[in-house]
Amino acid sequence: MMTSVGTNRARGNWEQPQNQNQTQHKQRPQATAEQIRLAQMISDHNDADFEEKVKQLIDITGKNQDECVIALHDCNGDVNRAINVLLEGNPDTHSWEMVGKKKGVSGQKDGGQTESNEEGKENRDRDRDYSRRRGGPPRRGRGASRGREFRGQENGLDGTKSGGPSGRGTDRGRRGRGRGRGSSGRRGGRFSAQGMGTFNPADYAEPANTDDNYGNSSGNTWNNTGHFEPDDGTRLDFIGVEGSNYPRKFETAPGAWRTATEEWGTEDWNEDLSETKIFTASNVSSVPLPAENVTITAGQRIDLAVLLGKTPSSMENDSSNLDPSQAPSLAQPLVFSNSKQNAISQPASGSTFSHHSMVSMLGKGFGDVGEAKGGSTTGSQFLEQFKTAQALAQLAAQHSQSGSTTTSSWDMGSTTQSPSLVQYDLKSANDSTVHSPFTKRQAFTPSSTMMEVFLQEKPPAVATSTAAPPPPSSPLPSKSTSAPQMSPGSSDNQSSSPQPAQQKLKQQKKKTSLTSKIPALAVEMPGSADISGLNLQFGALQFGSEPVLSDYESTPTTSASSSQAPSSLYTSTASESSSTVSSNQSQESGYQSGPIQSTTYTSQNNAQGPLYEQRSTQTRRYPSSISSSPQKDLTQAKNGFSSVQATQLQTTQSVEGATGSAVKSESPSTSSIPSLNETVPAASLLTTANQHSSSLSGLSHTEEIPNTTTTQHSSALSTQQNTLSSSTSSGRTSTSTLLHTSVESEANLHSSSSTFSTTSSTVSAPPPVVSVSSSLNSGSSLGLSLGSNSTVTASTRSSVATTSGKAPPNLPPGVPPLLPNPYIMAPGLLHAYPPQVYGYDDLQMLQTRFPLDYYSIPFPTPTTPLTGRDGSLASNPYSGDLTKFGRGDASSPAPATTLAQPQQNQTQTHHTTQQTFLNPALPPGYSYTSLPYYTGVPGLPSTFQYGPAVFPVAPTSSKQHGVNVSVNASATPFQQPSGYGSHGYNTGVSVTSSNTGVPDISGSVYSKTQQSFEKQGFHSGTPAASFNLPSALGSGGPINPATAAAYPPAPFMHILTPHQQPHSQILHHHLQQDGQTGSGQRSQTSSIPQKPQTNKSAYNSYSWGAN
């Protein structure tokens, strides 16, 4: 879904540049055009057509007339485009807004378009142009919105090549990352499925930061890219379009990484991962042997020399030992992680893992450097660096540097940690051996050396030996600490070296990756284990991981297998830039089984996390979390709280994850890291990667479980963490979409972080964790966790509610929950909700909610309450009350609060027994209001019979007040405004006041999101209309007449109800459907009346995030 969505958006944005161009062209003679338009506007001859179009637009899109008119106007009367604009999110609006800025760039943009026609040559030219344009100035340009936008547009052009997604990404606010986008676009060209939009969240999340911070800090790789972009860019240009892209691509890669949440991002990442693989090649440099790796090898060598200048010899030696066989594999997986992951994984896993170690170190470096420099670069840089550098650095640096050294380091981490890892590992007894498999997974770094050793089944010795060598290379290898130390240098070196390597790799990538362009992620994801490994994001990688786990399970076979599998995980990780974190996570997933979350999370966090984790599991982890938290925070500026929360949450999670006590202690940091990562991705991307780490994705989740098996806690933790991660991941996708939205979505998921919190709480207990995971997943709509979803729901239901509400917003995850949630909420939550809401007669209230009530109410109502009502309500007595109430309502909404009760009281007074029900129902009067809505749907008669009793009051007040939701029972409508705030919220239940309570929320928060809802006046206006009830009730004083009268309104109301159902519980749910924002609020409101206030705040940010 995400892919399609991304593509559509991309196309939409892709069109935007064209639209913008058109707009620009139009604007050039704008004065005349404006005059013409003014004339047209003044003249009436076009009005018929225009109005017809507007009406058409309104019917099709359901937008406001103003919006439709504006969109139509912007689209110059092009209804189709206007529809797209309205539904796609007004890409044109931005274009128009940007037109002024873009004009300067328009020439370039046009050139870009022209170039886009000549994709290959022009791409290179454009890349060179980008290098020049963006090289030195491009950085400024990047920083400058104009440059970015131009890049974005060009990217959009590229997007055309790339299939449009990049264009979309570029056009979006993510233009900030324009340069990266450009490369992304080109990459997109290489990979039709770029997921440009996917990493957009990250891009926009960290546009400028990425540029400067990127260049300066952890941007090591990025730094080179950015700083050296002119040179590198040129060099890259020589390499080819890819080369030029590379610097940007790094940027893009970060974006793509962020997109990790989306599957599209993975594609970009794969490219980036290829770059990463270049790094890997660097590692392989010792193993430059494979011709296929030649490019990579060269790149790797460069990376090794540059990145691992100090360690390359030892690293290379180790790598040579491991890599000789792995190098080709590694190179291949690295180059084309997606397709070759598994096969190549085996050898590659060593190298790859080395990279991973390196990445971890780099990640750690990023964490350290990122933290230090990350302050500024944290968010985008970290995300990017973590993802890109992580993937690249991981693969390249880890593979090359860490390959031997870091690998050793990792190995040390895993080997040295193997005792503790043993704690982590399910198979403590087999500590070395088991750990070795885990080390393979966990210490993928040693994997290159160690992995092969594992293959050789000398993992303990190798691990130890590897560990030993790394210490010599202590800068990198020395545990995570050294790794971090090294990583700064390494990362820097890597960054500079990687670009060339990546450039070369990129060419290769074009050769190799081109084949897997789109399939690599989107298509291949479901593909073979290798590909699945590549598709770390959604568990495909995990599939590779699963074998790894199995392999891990049996050390002997496992060694080779696990080498592959980890490689697969790792490589796939590396392969998927999105998997960068993912890959880390993927590894870490694999790791997870081994180092458990420490690796897993570390990987997730940053490679650094894993390094820390693995080296100094906890300590590093914490640094990782620190590093990652900056990342996350920056990345999650939106999710900032999330990242913090994630930390707590994840910490708990880590505990949960940490099956072993030692692991647990690490785990917290580890967990926190993943959480941060998730939060960081909040960013769907990071989250995805992060989640990935867990499972690299919700799906990974399952995969992770296998890992989990290996990693006992991992199974619970991995699974749960993965689940959490995956949940977040799913939720993010892209969330978000990564989408931000993914990011915001992520943030929301991270809001869900509560869920994570719950998770963390439950995390302690792996089962709860599972539940939590499930809940997150459910929020993420991870089918995987769905099973536990229930559990999670139970444990984290509130969070889940948020999540679920959010997940639907994160539609990218393809969460059907949106509809299900509304329905679930309507049936399930309503059931629970009404009881919650109605402490009164739950049965009656519920019944009122349900058809039975409609029927039963008519029976009961007529029987007891109805009679009483008929006497008083339908009859003059109630009408009299109504009048009083109406006056009371009219007098003050505050009294209205009382009014509802007074109504009840008076009604009760008049109809004590019967009114008792009615009255309790009445507080549910809101409920009744909703009932009229709700019942209006199925049992309007009953509702109205019931309602008339209420409505007669409502009619008076309602009519008096102009149908403030006349059905609300006069009091309610008024309560809505003022009374409701106190009353509705006071009555957590009154939230029911689906009408009032929700309308309140919707009015304030929701209305923003859902203007229609707002305009609906909280359904007060529409309900009033739909409720011709007041009049129906009023006119039909007797219940029967009222009912009869109500019937017509009821159908009408019913019709409205579907649309406005948010008012009633259905309305709530419906609004959720209608407005994702609403969904969050509504679903939580209805599902969690208790949380209305919290949800309310959460909704504001959360719902918005979701939207």
Curated annotation (Swiss-Prot):
Residues with the N-acetylmethionine modification: 1
Pfam families linked: UBAP2-Lig (PF12478)
Composition bias, Polar residues: 590-656, 689-713, 1088-1107
Composition bias, Basic residues: 133-145
Source domain of life: Eukaryota
Subcellular location: Nucleus; Chromosome; Cytoplasm; Cytoplasm, Stress granule
Subunit (UniProt): Interacts with BMI1. Part of a complex consisting of UBAP2L, BMI1 and RNF2. Interacts with G3BP1 (via NTF2 domain); promoting stress granule formation.
Asymmetric dimethylarginine modification, residue list: 187, 190
Function: Recruits the ubiquitination machinery to RNA polymerase II for polyubiquitination, removal and degradation, when the transcription-coupled nucleotide excision repair (TC-NER) machinery fails to resolve DNA damage. Plays an important role in the activity of long-term repopulating hematopoietic stem cells (LT-HSCs). Is a regulator of stress granule assembly, required for their efficient formation. Required for proper brain development and neocortex lamination.
Taxonomy of the source species: Eukaryota, Metazoa, Chordata, Craniata, Vertebrata
Phenotype of null mutants: Ubap2l knockout results in a lethal phenotype in a majority of embryos. Mice with heterozygous Ubap2l deletion have cognitive impairment and behavioral abnormalities, including lower preference for social novelty, mild repetitive behavior, anxious-like behavior, and abnormal spatial working memory compared to wild-type mice. Stress granule intensity and numbers are reduced in developing brains of Ubap2l-deficient mice compared to controls, and neocortex development and lamination is abnormal.
Modified residues (Phosphoserine): 376, 380, 436, 474, 487, 490-491, 497, 624-625, 628-629, 872, 879
Protein name: Ubiquitin-associated protein 2-like
UniProt domain UBA: residue ranges: 49-89
Phosphothreonine: residues bearing it: 445
Keywords from the named record: Acetylation, Chromosome, Cytoplasm, Methylation, Nucleus, Phosphoprotein
Composition skew (Low complexity), residue ranges: 213-226, 494-505, 554-589, 665-675, 714-804, 893-916, 1073-1087
Encoding gene per record: Ubap2l
One CC-aspect GO term: chromosome
Location (main, coarse): nucleus
CDD domains, per database record: UBA_UBP2_like (cd14277)
Region (Disordered): 1-33, 92-229, 461-513, 550-676, 689-814, 885-921, 1060-1107
GO terms of biological process kind: binding of sperm to zona pellucida; hematopoietic stem cell homeostasis; positive regulation of stress granule assembly; stress granule assembly
Gene3D superfamilies: DNA helicase RuvA subunit, C-terminal domain (1.10.8.10)
Basic and acidic residues bias (residue ranges): 118-132
InterPro entries the UniProt entry points to: TC-DDR_regulator, UBA, UBA-like_sf, UBAP2/Lig
